[in-house]
Amino acid sequence: MKRSFLLPIAIGLTLSLPALAAPAKKAQAACPSQKFSTFFAAFSDSVPLQKAFTDYPLTTVMLDHAVEPEPRKISKQLPMSKLSFPLIPPKAVRTKQGLAFRVDQETDNNAKVSLFKVDTGYQVAYFFRKESCWKLERREDWSM
């Protein structure tokens, strides 16, 4: 009787071992588009896409306004854990806050988008690079 009881447990353990040996891989997000305008429209409105298609650590450039007599440029490499998402406000927020964006540069493999507010010192530039898909590689905040 003991033997018949132990056999199913042993078989169950044997069958479970391959699942334990290889950890499950995270599902890779599908590239929204190879065309930058379509990619950016999806990327700018989706935190999961922003997380999936950003290079880490993200190069972040900003102005230190506490320095006298002029602000100085600071460059940091920020891991995902130090970033606040969304990196680009979604369309509804941009509209509510009067923010606009323009594509300043676009080639087959690089693009630069500026997010700004007219008649204010708000200006943030986003730099993208395309490999198998577009990825955000740098953010520069020149806001005054």
How should each PLM-predicted stretch be described?
Residues F40, S44-P48, E137-S143:
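Charged, low-complexity intrinsically disordered segments
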Residues F39-A42, L49-V67, I74:
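Short, well-ordered alpha-helical segments enriched in acidic and aromatic residues
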Residues L63-D119:
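Surface-exposed, charged secondary-structure patches
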Residues A22-D45:
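Short, low-complexity N-terminal intrinsically disordered segments enriched in polar/charged residues
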Residues P8-S16:
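Bacterial N-terminal signal peptides
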